[in-house]
Amino acid sequence: MVKLTMEPVTRIEGHAKITVHLDDAGNVEDTRLHVMEFRGFEKFLQGRPIEEAPRIVPRICGICDVQHHLAAAKAVDACFGFEPDDVLPAAYKMREIMNWGSYMHSHGLHFYFLAAPDFIAGKDRKTRNVFQIIKDAPDVALQAIELRKNALEIVRATGGRPIHPTSSTPGGISTELDDETQKDLLQKAQRNVELAEATLELAVPIFEENIDLVNSLGNIETYHTGLVKNGVWDVYDGIVRIKDKEGNLFREFKPADYADTIAEHVKPYSWLKFPYIKDLGYPDGVYRVSPLSRLNVADKMPDAAPKAQDYFKEFQDKFGYAQQTLLYHWARLIEVLACAECAADALEGDLSGEKFPDSLERQAGDGVGIVEAPRGTLTHHYTCDENGLITKANIVVATIQNNPAMEMGIQKVAQDYIKPGVEVDDKIFNLMEMVIRAYDPCLSCATHTIDSQMRLATLEVYDSEGDLVKRI
């Protein structure tokens, strides 16, 4: 038996490894994605006042911190008796603007710095990184920095600070925008519309040049899940829509009912669980949450985003109900444009209304908040007692939900490229990494130590008893 190990997986947020298990004939027997980090944030929340949750949970991550903040805020709203539409309109809109700003920042980071090197910087490992992009196309690098800077300024103004926001309160928000700040943010959002269009003009031809790879690499057929509001793409509020493998409507449910639909499978080699649709069982019920999933389940883009709607229609006309993993990148860039347009539209409006309820009253019981994080659907579920203290917390992040699909995708790559007598090199492992990168997994939810002996690629050979006999 031979086990091939890639450690760490590069250009993702966090650390993971891939192991490929070969039988005695050299055929792929199994492929695994190992995530051995553990944080246990749910336990940290127990005993804390429920209103503190939105200020605590952003520390789970420095990239999707806004979405943890907002999902927690919506769960807290529910614990105070507020439905999403009960939140004061100006506060609701401010939360949306914060979310759109975070999307532009996160998606921009992923495409330009983590994903683009695979398509722009060549096939040599030494040049396949963001530094080569900076060297070869400094204007593109500056474009990426400007887009993310503008996005973070929007988050700073609405969230109280650019990282780990604190502004959402039960039923409202604590930040205000004066006229000068709102005008400045509007200009930044409008500029990001231009930058998002420029990014699509740059990226779409590159994707089309690599269409054979797009149509073949790590593709699997799964169910897709995402929020919609009256059938329209939405990343802050709505109902959860599930479509089956053929694109037919399978189910729609309210956020509070998520536990009736989703269950979790456990495997011993990873801290990440393997969620699935309860009625279908595992692995038949594997589903994905992602930018691609959101486009797949939506009927259209918001009226405030006509340019994104044009790209969305073109995307649907070309690919229909898309299952290709590498199309995540294309979908991600359409969302950047949509968020920039939506933010600009909102910032042109009146945001001066009341943002904090006149009275608050805690209610013992459960509160569930669901938003769409950049990587997919994010759920925060809290139970609190009559004193308003959290007794139980459950956080279901997008990367956990995509975990089964990521592993299935790298299994397919391994089976397609690793054959008896074929030398396994870093190019094959990079193809597996490309599949994982497409999902933009966020594993960096913990501050952890990296082994100083960690290598970019390791070949481990085991004997028939499973004992390690050689490491190269």
UniProtKB/Swiss-Prot annotation:
Ni(2+) binds at residues 61, 64, 442, 445. It comes from the Archaea. It is an enzyme of class 1 (oxidoreductase). Its cofactor is Ni(2+). Its EC number is 1.12.99.-. Belongs to the [NiFe]/[NiFeSe] hydrogenase large subunit family. This is F420-non-reducing hydrogenase subunit A.
